[in-house]
Amino acid sequence: MSYTLQRPGEDISVEEHMARTSLFARLEDLVAWSRKNSLWPFNFGLSCCYVEQVTALTSVYDQARFGAEVIRASPRQADLLVVSGTVFHKMAAPLLRLYEQMRAPRWVISMGACANSGGMYDIYSVVQGVDSFLPVDVYIPGCPPRPEAVLDALIMLQQQVGSEHRPLGVTVGNSAGLGFDAPRRRDQRRDERMAQTLLDPPEKL
């Protein structure tokens, strides 16, 4: 789009006016752009990782730059679930219920070693990774991760959301509406990751 100056009272053609004031794009691209730049998070904080997550909201880190500063009080208003901390088996069912109440399309960020893999708590009462019952889109490693890692994960999720083309509504079948969930990138690369035998050292991450 080019910008030009115009004097008051100067007449221009309709075609030139349309070229200056209109933007043409596919509807799917506009919807993906708006979803990417206005993620509405619902935070599910259980332990020390949540303190670092809330620190990312402060003016020092300014999460508002990425359009995800408004934390929703209800899962029905959110499209991003951020799970941070140790998830016990008692909390798995309420967490799954909160996820199911979110409106599609929805995304999940797992924050910290405890949410990713159970952390140091290899015991009967701790869920060994929230991806055992939730489709996680982005993992944030660390114990606890720094606020910069939270912002980096948010940028990664925005890039993923901007490249996805999900339906605008609900697909209606013969008698009931069926929700839509896109295949997760984690699932698409599962075989490749399972075949890896050499891991990068922490300095390269």
Curated annotation (Swiss-Prot):
* CC terms in the record's Gene Ontology section: plasma membrane; respiratory chain complex I
Q: Per the UniProt entry, what species is this protein from, by scientific name?
A: Rhodopseudomonas palustris (strain BisB18)
Keywords recorded for this protein, A-Z:
4Fe-4S, Cell inner membrane, Cell membrane, Iron, Iron-sulfur, Membrane, Metal-binding, NAD, Quinone, Translocase, Transport, Ubiquinone
User: What InterPro entries does this protein map onto?
Assistant: NADH_UbQ_OxRdtase-like_20kDa (IPR006137), NADH_UQ_OxRdtase_20Kd_su (IPR006138)
Give the matching Pfam families.
Oxidored_q6
Taxonomy, top ranks, is: Bacteria, Pseudomonadati, Pseudomonadota, Alphaproteobacteria, Hyphomicrobiales
Tell me what gene encodes this: nuoB2
How cofactor binds (record note)?
Answer: Binds 1 [4Fe-4S] cluster.
Catalytic reaction annotation: a quinone + NADH + 5 H(+)(in) = a quinol + NAD(+) + 4 H(+)(out)
Which residue intervals are annotated with compositional bias (Basic and acidic residues) in the record? 182-194
In the record, biological process GO terms are: aerobic respiration; electron transport coupled proton transport
The protein's required cofactor(s) are namely: [4Fe-4S] cluster
Tell me the membrane topology, using the record's own terms. Peripheral membrane protein
Family assignment from sequence similarity: Belongs to the complex I 20 kDa subunit family.
Summary of the function given for this chain in its UniProt record = NDH-1 shuttles electrons from NADH, via FMN and iron-sulfur (Fe-S) centers, to quinones in the respiratory chain. The immediate electron acceptor for the enzyme in this species is believed to be ubiquinone. Couples the redox reaction to proton translocation (for every two electrons transferred, four hydrogen ions are translocated across the cytoplasmic membrane), and thus conserves the redox energy in a proton gradient.
Q: Which Gene3D superfamilies does the record associate with it? A: 3.40.50.12280
Q: How does it associate, per the subunit comment?
A: NDH-1 is composed of 14 different subunits. Subunits NuoB, C, D, E, F, and G constitute the peripheral sector of the complex.
**Amino acids binding [4Fe-4S] cluster:** 48-49, 114, 143
Q: Any stretches that span the bilayer, and where are they?
A: none
Task: Quote the EC number.
Answer: 7.1.1.-
Molecular function in Gene Ontology: 4 iron, 4 sulfur cluster binding; iron ion binding; NADH dehydrogenase (ubiquinone) activity; NADH:ubiquinone reductase (non-electrogenic) activity; quinone binding
Region Disordered: which residues?
Answer: 175-205
- Where does the record say this protein resides? Cell inner membrane
Identification of the protein by name: NADH-quinone oxidoreductase subunit B 2
